[in-house]
Amino acid sequence: MKAFANLLLEANHVVVFTGAGMSTESGLDDFRTKTSGLWERFNPQELATVDALTHNREQFIQFYRYRLQAVFDAGPHEGHHILNEWEKNKTIQSIITQNVDGFHSLAGNRKVRELHGSFSTFYCHDCQAPYEATYFLENAQCHCGGTIRPSIVLFGEGLPQNTFQIAE
């Protein structure tokens, strides 16, 4: 551990990459754990694709309301706050995460790149009008009639190119 700490302190540019372990420590389910992962209990093709959004709308909405409520019920843990302190004292320069819970930003980090998007914002799939996450819990229909969805990458969608450019 001491060797790692020395490397961290001596490095010129440190980027932290986080994934599901950070979210599970906050109490959120991961996707692929054999006994408790989301995809053990739910079929991703029925719930986490653009096709599901358009052809299985009610189940799509209920699934993402369930996930959003889980995020609201949880929150950043000590590890998130430690990374915030490291950013403040310039031990790390940024965080790249696969997580969509937004906990790094809630903990105070400012230089966060969310590869798969975030539950912190939602938008209409048809007209792209932005919505607050709390609005989605009560109403998933946009003023244009389209379906409101989380600002996350669904199965079959590409990762946003600007995320890679910024991350580099």
Language model features with spans:
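Conserved catalytic core of sirtuin-type NAD+-dependent deacylases
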Residues: M1-E168
